[in-house]
């Protein structure tokens, strides 16, 4: 069973402007990922960084939905020195923001097979920095799974 780490934007994608086709497709792909987690076909990770981002979300409806989705995450990861050290090394490798570096470090630390994000710039940064966390857009993940 795949262990996946979803960037926080995947938890919120369903609230973004559905008039843009890319956003609508990503929202559907994220919804499918959460349905697969519900059916125990995949495992998801919830980290202290997700929790932190959700605390600072100014929209109560979004916060509540993210907390509901968080219940689907079977693997939980709290703050650890090893994660912070790994995040610092990722920042040096790829000039990642602290937040992105911590999400990537959490994915790496939990041995998640995939890091899923709606942020194409982040995907390109991860790939060019040679960080060994397979990073995909949710639509690309669903497309790959359909080809199996």
Explain the meaning of each model-derived region:
Residues 1-3:
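Non-catalytic pre-domain segments flanking phosphatase-related domains
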Residues 5-58, 139-143:
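PIN/NYN-family metal-dependent endoribonuclease catalytic core
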Residues 11-12, 17-27, 93, 104, ...:
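Acidic, PIN/NYN-like endoribonuclease modules and their adjacent C-terminal/linker elements
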Residues 30-35, 63-67, 104:
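Short amphipathic alpha-helical segments and helix-helix/interface helices
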Residues 40-43, 73-75, 111-114:
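Short active-site oxyanion
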Residues 49-52, 71-94:
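Acidic catalytic patch
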Residues 56-71:
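Short, electropositive alpha-helical surface patch
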């Amino acid at each position: 069973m795949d262990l996946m780490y979803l960037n926080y934007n995947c938890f919120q994608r369903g609230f973004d402007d559905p008039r843009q086709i890319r956003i609508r497709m990503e929202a559907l792909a994220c919804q499918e990922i959460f349905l697969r987690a519900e059916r125990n076909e995949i495992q998801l990770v919830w980290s202290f960084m997700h929790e932190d981002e959700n605390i600072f979300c100014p929209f109560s409806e979004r916060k509540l939905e993210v907390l509901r989705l968080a219940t689907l995450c079977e693997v939980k990861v709290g703050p650890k020195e090893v994660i912070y050290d790994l995040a610092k090394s990722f920042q040096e490798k790829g000039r990642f923001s602290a937040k992105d570096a911590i999400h990537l470090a959490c994915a790496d630390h939990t041995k998640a097979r995939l890091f899923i994000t709606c942020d194409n710039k982040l995907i390109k940064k991860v790939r060019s920095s040679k960080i060994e966390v397979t990073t995909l857009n949710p639509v690309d993940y669903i497309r790959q799974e359909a080809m199996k």
